Amino acid sequence: MKIGIIGAMEPEVAHLIAAMTNATSQTIAGIEFIAGTLAGKDVVVTRSGIGKVAASIATTLLIEKYAPDAVINTGSAGGFVDTLAIGDIVISSEVRHHDVDVTAFGYEIGQMAQQPAAFVPAAHLVEAANKAIAQLGEVKAIEGLICTGDSFICDPIRTQAMLKNFPTMAACEMEGAAIAQVCHQFGVPFVVIRSLSDNANNDSPVDFDSYIVKAGYHSALMVMLLLEQLNPSAIK
């Protein structure tokens, strides 16, 4: 069993890479892929870069070159749930694009043409994540809708517009749905796990800079605990 792990930024993958053993590195198209062992599993970790195009390129290369049995997207996100604090975690129940609109052709808001409206993570990955929650200590984790777009959301007016379109949205970020769409295309199971770095409001730029390391650590911890819970026989 081999697991691909993708984070957009250095703080989102640094703790994972530091915990790996037997690590080897290969750079393809300017993207570094680090293969090794983490939490007893064979993994390939990569820093994709920020945004949907960068994430799509990295995910495609990861799948084509390393053939992972599953892909985990880790990192930070803006939060939309009042009961969650900065550093808490959202496990994807589904992932959607929040900045796609081809409704003129009969699609749902957020649904790309010829794609599903929502990308649903693999049940065995979500199950492993939920089993790991008990080991997080004071960090809270929930399942919820994660939305993706090529914007850093810090405008309350835009936040309200997004919630009108996606009232159950728990978090937003800039890569997850792109990674999920590539995994869907290749038939590779995925899950998105995000720790909150901000609350998608006017304070978000300051909060993000202050808390990205904390969010990256919590998300990485969740990934490692998930890997420990993951049953190789569950991989499909």
UniProtKB/Swiss-Prot annotation:
Hydrolase as a keyword of this entry, yes or no, is yes
Q: Which BP terms does GO give this entry?
A: L-methionine salvage from methylthioadenosine; L-methionine salvage from S-adenosylmethionine; nucleoside catabolic process
- Please tell me where substrate binds in this chain: G78, I153, M174, E175
Organism field: Shewanella baltica (strain OS185)
Keyword Zinc-finger carried by entry: no
As its record notes, the protein acts as a catalyst of: S-adenosyl-L-homocysteine + H2O = S-(5-deoxy-D-ribos-5-yl)-L-homocysteine + adenine; S-methyl-5'-thioadenosine + H2O = 5-(methylsulfanyl)-D-ribose + adenine; 5'-deoxyadenosine + H2O = 5-deoxy-D-ribose + adenine
What protein family is recorded? Belongs to the PNP/UDP phosphorylase family. MtnN subfamily.
For this chain, one GO molecular function annotation is: methylthioadenosine nucleosidase activity
Organism classification = Bacteria, Pseudomonadati, Pseudomonadota, Gammaproteobacteria, Alteromonadales
| EC assignment | 3.2.2.9
Please explain the role this protein plays, according to its UniProt record. Catalyzes the irreversible cleavage of the glycosidic bond in both 5'-methylthioadenosine (MTA) and S-adenosylhomocysteine (SAH/AdoHcy) to adenine and the corresponding thioribose, 5'-methylthioribose and S-ribosylhomocysteine, respectively. Also cleaves 5'-deoxyadenosine, a toxic by-product of radical S-adenosylmethionine (SAM) enzymes, into 5-deoxyribose and adenine.
> What is one GO cellular-component annotation here?
cytosol
Q: Which InterPro entries match?
A: MTA_SAH_Nsdase, Nucleoside_phosphorylase_d, Nucleoside_phosphorylase_sf
Q: So, what pathway does this thing act in?
A: Amino-acid biosynthesis; L-methionine biosynthesis via salvage pathway; S-methyl-5-thio-alpha-D-ribose 1-phosphate from S-methyl-5'-thioadenosine (hydrolase route): step 1/2
Pfam families membership: PNP_UDP_1 (PF01048)
Q: Where is the active site?
A: E12 (proton acceptor), D198 (proton donor)
The name of this protein is 5'-methylthioadenosine/S-adenosylhomocysteine nucleosidase
Sorted UniProt keywords: Amino-acid biosynthesis, Hydrolase, Methionine biosynthesis
